[in-house]
Amino acid sequence: MLGKAGNNMQYIGFDIQDTHYGIASDNIIEILQDGVITPLPCAPQGVCGMTHYQGRSYPVLDLYDILEVPVDTSLSCMIMVETKQHYYFVNVHTIPYLFED
């Protein structure tokens, strides 16, 4: 897969149990450690709440909840993702790493 400049695409990776996942670095705005998440009552599965970033509120998705796997909640790492005109955070509960395709 090629990036915008024709180079190999870079990804921010993280592991959930024994599976590796990645988000294209072109879509990543920010990575936050230990951000504050405000729970939302009656939120659908996978939406763990909202967080504030630079004066705006954004939804936070929890991949562990979406995939229905247990999580050690002592660590929180949120990746801000941009997709077209939408922004949201993904809480991955692990330290992300960089890799290339």
Model regions: which residues?
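An acidic, low-aromatic, low-complexity terminal/linker signal
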Residues: 1-101
